[in-house]
Swiss-Prot record:
Potyviral RNA is expressed as two polyproteins which undergo post-translational proteolytic processing. Genome polyprotein is processed by NIa-pro, P1 and HC-pro proteinases resulting in the production of at least ten individual proteins. P3N-PIPO is cleaved by P1 and HC-pro proteinases resulting in the production of three individual proteins. The P1 proteinase and the HC-pro cleave only their respective C-termini autocatalytically. The record marks 547-548, 1004-1005 as: Cleavage. One of its GO terms (biological process) is viral translational frameshifting. It is an enzyme of class 3 (hydrolase). This is P3N-PIPO polyprotein. It comes from Papaya ringspot virus (strain P / mutant HA). GO terms for molecular function: cysteine-type endopeptidase activity; serine-type peptidase activity. GO terms for cellular component: host cell plasmodesma.
Length: 1228
């Protein structure tokens, strides 16, 4: 069977290796490579062409055969590829439907499948191919040589035979009237016939078997089948027929039918033999698949009968032999009462059976009295088997007869000595040395062969590899007759390791000249063997391959060093691994660790020695990746080698390749020499070195990291929750994904958003809260967005720009408004945790992210707070008109942006709710708290608006305002940016508890009147009646006075604090407690000498006031403002205290002094006004007194009195300081 297929390499690379290393080497590789499930494994079997043709005949049809014969080589190759897969995988193929078919469950597929759902597997394997070949040999009854001889002519004949199928004649028969009786089974199994019913029945058309002899079809016997009768229910009364007789007749008919079929096939075979043996008759032999199958089955039955007869004869023969032996040994009687027993060791042997105790039944009887006990102590005679003596089976004693030895005389003595000496040498493996007058030759024994010690085995290259002389050759030839003899050896099998081998060459061997009858192997050149005793030219022995066993020397040194230097073991070592595989793995490890072409080459070793550590790691990684697949092919037995090499690779290649990070860190640290920068530099340098760093450098890096951890821990402990210094709120680098703007159903062909029905309902926004821009007024008319607290300039004027580049750049210049650093006002807290979406955006270093110039657009709404802005067309019915939010309604842009995410069927309800619920409640200039609350209410009705994207919201901390940016942009820049980007995030302003000052900012306008509380207090501080009314309405304005020590002391000295205490002592105890603390603080501030000391007293006592006020919640506006002021003072005190401990100073004292000086100038202005008004009032009073005096007194005294009044007036107005009535004089 091996001649029907061969194993060949499918890859061209393996085929080239086959030409170099031989077919045996490739077969060994393919055996290791051929695993189950390898889909390319089938192409590695070169199957005989005849076998593939027979497989095609078996599974194909006439159309496939005709296509194969008439097709080109590509068609034949495709069909042969299918045939090969069916033979190697045993998966069926249907050529009509061109589908692969499972043999078990009829599953079909267009592609070859290796595993079916029913559990059958169709992997490519040599076992499947051998089974297919066996089936072909059995079905076609051919030998492997006959299958190899099958060619295309056989296929062509098979196709012709199939096309000329047996003609079958059909014999029609008319419709007959059959007697149909209903049949029922009686209880006794007898068929009874009742009244018959006549029904028409059509008999089946029978086919006649024919034999085609030449062109004459010969009909055979027509086989009639029993017609199928469908009966009707009824009873059978006839007793004329029995069931057994009918069944017997049916069986006989079936047997007769089988015999007729067999006779037909035999007749066909006879006809074919006649057509083959009588060519003169010109008869065409008959061929069909059924005939071939019947022929194979018939031969199989004959072979099976013959084999069964032979097996039966052998059984009878063996039975007779064992029966005779048993009878002769009398085993039946000897094994009586014995059985085969298996002992503990598993040995089967005969043993006597043990008697079983028989149970006895107690007879039940009535109770009676025992009067006598009788015992018979006699013993019965025990039965013993007679001893049958066995047959003597001992062997006879061997008697050695003395042998006579013939006397050795003459040369036979030397031969006798040599023979015995050689036998001893071969038996014990003893080396022997032949010595003549001027020559020596050493012969060694190895693996049952004799070898001569040659010079090249010791590394010496010479013309003659061993010394020679005539006497030595005579002795050598005579000695080799007994030492070597005539052991067969093929010279072509000699290779490396055969140096010095002694053998007797044959006549046809390709060998060089040699002396005597024996040849001493030295090497080979050009396929020719050379003797070690021959003198060769330098050109010959320099090029020849000397068959020295280098591996033996290598393993000799390896074994000697390994045994000498290995450590003692704690267990008993066993040989579990293949030595050959150990050598292969050792070679791979050598190549990976020391990449070279030859391990004995000094140049290769010099290159390996001259490598630096980086080159060693790179070479190791490269070689390991190249040979990893080969190393993994040896399985888990050598997993320790792969693990060690991988660990070594990780250690040597643990280098830091991130040069960019190293340079950036070094650049940012620059030349800073103070801690912790020096520690960071040490760690950065050590990390960059990677595995090249020494142990000392790693120790230094660990110490530096410990110092950094200490520094950071100390810094972290100094930062508490809610502090400004630790706040970071970076803006997201990715733009928000708004699904409403990316839905294809809501975009036009240009990708713009389609409002649909929302556009019609959006008119409620534009009619109530937007105004149309009048172009006749010019864009500059709308460029100033004025609010009650300030002005913001928008960039609507930049819609008209100059084509001059210089002027256009001037138009793009922004107006920067400094908002200061991040303060407590920028941060929102909830349970002492940051609420980032309700806070201002910061950069990486904690500085605020400020707005830039916003360029204008026409008829758009601008969305997005992170990434690039998104421009959506306004839902206006007039495309040429431009709309801008009315004064105080900039926040309507938020609800207009929410309309984008509202479904069209809800747009009407949404716009109505905005108009009736939001617009009516918020009005102009609402706070962010109210806007967020209304947005939360709308989300309850319209959940789709929760993810709506907001326009950018800018925060103006100076004006306590939030600006909602529309499409007209902003020229003013420098505003802080609110991080909230969606409606869900904006709603966080309306959820308590939230500690945020920005929630009270107005959206697009003026802040609460409390923003000017201090200035309002300064305006009425010299107006007793107005100050009395203000402190009764807003008692916590006294706490606001802590912003300026001058204002605080003025209130205290004027008696306003005492008056407020007397007023509120009967009305609110919480307010009284706060006023009492403020009065005590005023006494402490009075003792302070400088402004800095006064501020320190206020800030040190701010926390106590804050804790006292934080216990309650008061309805006054000044309460929230004073609470926030105290919180700022308390936090700034903690921050400055930490900085002062670290040795840093702040600019806050200088700032406070400057502000206080400014407030004192305001006080001076107020005081000047009061003095001026007092002077005028005094002069008017004096004039009135003079007039009255002139009327009452005499005229002569009027002049004198007038001078006295003028002098008194001058004294009071210019010098008298107590002439002006103070505020304290007005409280009564």
């Amino acid at each position: 069977m091996s001649s029907l297929y061969t194993l060949r390499a499918a890859a061209q690379y393996d085929r080239r290796l086959e030409s170099k290393k031989g077919s045996g080497w490739v077969e060994h590789k393919l055996e290791r490579k051929g695993e189950r499930g390898n889909t390319h494994y089938c192409s590695e079997f070169d199957i005989s062409k005849g076998a593939k043709i027979l497989q095609l005949v078996q599974i194909g049809n006439t159309e496939v055969g005709r296509t194969f014969l008439e097709g080109n080589r590509f068609v034949r190759a495709n069909i042969f590829e299918i045939i090969r897969k069916t033979m190697v995988g045993r998966l069926g193929y249907d050529f009509e439907s061109e589908l692969w078919v499972c043999r078990n469950c009829d599953k079909t597929s267009e592609k070859y499948f290796k595993k079916c759902d029913c559990g059958e597997t169709y992997y490519y394997s040599e076992r499947n191919l051998m089974r297919t070949m066996n089936d072909l040999m059995y079905q076609f009854d051919m030998t492997p040589s006959e299958i190899n001889s099958v060619d295309l002519e056989y296929l062509a004949n098979a196709v012709d035979y199939a096309e000329q199928l047996v003609k079958r004649s059909q014999v029609p028969e008319p419709v007959e009237l059959a007697m149909m009786e209903p049949i029922v089974a009686s209880g006794e199994g007898i068929l009874m016939v009742s009244e018959p019913e006549v029904m028409p029945v059509t008999t089946k058309v029978e086919e006649a078997w024919t034999i085609q002899i030449g062109e004459i079809p010969v009909p055979l016997v027509v086989i009639k089948e029993t017609p199928v009768i469908s009966g009707v229910e009824g009873t059978l009364n006839s007793t004329g027929f029995s069931l057994e007789a009918d069944i017997t007749k049916l069986v006989e008919k079936e047997i007769l039918q089988e015999e007729v079929k067999e006779a037909v096939h035999l007749a066909l075979e006879v006809g074919n033999e006649i057509a083959e043996k009588k060519p003169e008759l010109k008869l065409i032999p008959y061929w069909s698949a059924s005939l071939e199958l019947h022929k194979r089955i018939r031969k199989h039955k004959e072979h099976a009968k013959i084999a069964a007869i032979q097996v039966q004869k052998e059984r009878e023969k063996d039975q007779k032999v064992f029966s005779a032996l048993e009878l002769r040994l009398n085993l039946k009687s000897r094994r009586r009462n014995q059985a085969v027993v298996c002992d503990k060791r598993g040995t089967l042997k005969w043993e006597t059976q043990r008697g079983h105790k028989k149970s006895k039944l107690m007879q039940q009887a009535s109770d009676f009295v025992v009067t006598q006990i009788h015992c018979d102590f006699g013993c019965k005679t025990q039965y013993s088997e007679p001893h049958i003596p066995g047959i003597k089976q001992s062997t006879s004693k061997k008697i050695c007869k003395p042998r006579k030895h013939s006397r050795i005389v003459g040369n036979s003595k030397i031969n006798y000595i040599m023979k015995n000496l050689c036998d001893t040498i071969i038996e014990r493996g003893i080396p022997v040395e032949l010595v003549t007058k001027r020559c020596k030759r050493r012969i060694l024994q190895k693996e049952g062969r004799s070898y001569v010690q040659l010079r090249h085995m010791n590394g010496i290259r010479a013309r003659q590899d061993v010394s020679s002389s005539p006497d030595m050759e005579l002795l050598f030839t005579q000695f080799c007759k007994f030492l070597v003899g005539h052991k067969p050896l093929k010279s072509k099998n000699l290779t490396f390791g055969s140096s010095g081998l002694i053998f007797k060459p044959k006549f046809a061997d390709n060998v060089g000249r040699y002396f005597g009858d024996y040849f001493v192997v030295r090497g080979r050149l050009g396929g020719k063997l050379f003797d070690g005793r021959s003198k060769l030219a330098r050109s010959v022995y320099a090029k020849m391959d000397q068959y020295n066993d280098v591996a033996e020397k290598f393993w000799l040194g390896f074994n000697r060093a390994f045994l000498r230097h290995r450590k003692p073991t704690d267990h008993t070592c066993t040989s579990d691994m293949d030595v050959t595989m150990c050598g292969e793995v050792a070679a791979l490890a050598t190549i990976i660790l020391f990449p070279c072409h030859k391990i004995t080459c000094n140049t290769c070793m010099s290159k390996v020695k001259g490598r630096v550590i980086d080159e060693v790691g790179e070479d190791l990684n490269c070689e390991l990746e190249r040979l990893r697949e080969t190393l993994s092919a040896y399985g888990g037995s050598f997993g320790h080698v792969s693990t060690l090499l991988d660990q070594l690779n990780r250690v040597l290649n643990a280098r830091n390749m991130n040069d960019g990070a190293f340079k950036e860190i070094a650049k940012k640290i620059d030349e800073k020499k103070e801690s912790p920068w020096t520690h960071m530099t040490t760690i950065n340098n050590t990390l960059y070195k990677g595995s090249l760093a020494t142990g000392y450098e790693f120790e230094r890096a660990s110490n530096s990291l410990r110092e950094i951890v200490r520094w950071h821990l100390k810094r972290t402990e100094s930062i508490k929750a809610g502090s400004v210094e630790s706040f970071r709120n970076k803006r997201s680098g990715k733009a928000h994904f708004n699904p409403a703007l990316t839905c294809d159903n809501q975009l036009d062909k240009n990708g713009n958003f389609l409002w649909g029905e929302r556009q019609y309902h959006a008119k409620r926004f534009f009619a109530n809260y937007f105004e149309k821009i009048d172009h006749s007024k010019g864009y500059e008319y709308y460029s100033q967005r004025q609010n009650p607290n300030g002005i913001r300039k928008i960039a609507i004027g930049n819609l008209v720009f100059s084509t001059n580049l210089e002027r256009f750049r001037q138009q793009m210049v922004e107006h920067h408004i400094d908002q200061g650093p991040i303060t407590r006002e920028c941060i929102a807290l909830r349970n002492n945790n940051y609420v980032h979406v309700c806070s201002c955006v910061t950069l990486d270093d904690g500085t605020p992210a400020t707005s830039e110039l916003k360029t204008p657009t026409k008829n758009h709404i601008v969305l997005g707070n992170s990434g690039d802005p998104k421009y959506v067309d306004l839902p206006t019915l007039e495309s040429d008109s431009m709309y801008i939010a009315k004064k105080g309604y900039c926040y309507m842009n938020i609800f207009l942006a929410m309309l984008i995410n509202i479904p069209e069927n809800e747009a009407k309800d949404f716009t109505k709710r905005v108009r009736d619920l939001v617009g009516s409640k918020l009005g102009e200039w609402p706070t962010m708290l109210d806007v967020a609350t209304c947005a939360n209410q709308l989300v309850v009705f319209h959940p789709d608006a929760a993810n709506a994207e907001l326009p950018q919201i800018l925060v103006d901390h100076r004006q306590k305002t939030m600006h909602v940016i529309d499409s007209f942009g902003s020229v003013d820049s420098g505003y802080h940016i609110l991080k909230a980007n969606t409606v869900n995030q904006l709603i966080q302003f309306a959820r308590d508890p939230l500690d945020s000052e920005m929630k009270h900012y107005i959206v697009g306008g003026e802040f609460d009147p409390t923003t000017n509380c201090l200035h309002q207090l300064i305006r009425v501080i010299y107006k007793p009646h107005e100050l009395r009314s203000l402190l009764r309405n807003e008692p916590y304005l006294i706490v606001i006075a802590l912003m300026s020590p001058s204002v605080l002391l003025t209130l205290f000295n004027s008696g306003a604090v005492e008056h407020a205490l007397n007023y509120w002592i009967k009305r609110d105890q919480d307010v009284v407690e706060v006023i009492v603390l403020v009065e005590q603080l005023c006494r402490k501030v009075t003792l302070a000498r400088t402004i800095l000391e006064q501020f320190n007293e206020i800030r040190q006592n701010a926390r106590d006031l804050h804790e006292l006020m934080d216990r309650n919640n008061k309805p006054w506006i000044s309460y929230d403002r004073s609470l926030e002021l105290l919180s700022v003072y308390a936090n700034s005190q903690l921050t400055d205290e930490g900085l002062l401990k670290q040795g840093f100073s702040t600019l806050d004292p200088r700032l406070r002094e400057a502000v206080e000086k400014n407030l004192r100038h305001s006080f001076a202005g107020r005081m000047a006004c009061v003095k001026f008004v007092s002077k005028v009032a005094l002069k008017v009073l004096c004039v009135q007194i003079t007039t009255v005096f002139f009327r009452v007194f005499k005229a002569k005294r009027a002049r004198r009195f007038k001078n006295c009044i003028r002098l008194l007036t001058e004294i009071l107005c210019t010098r008298g300081r107590k002439s002006v009535p103070t505020a304290s004089q007005g409280w009564g």
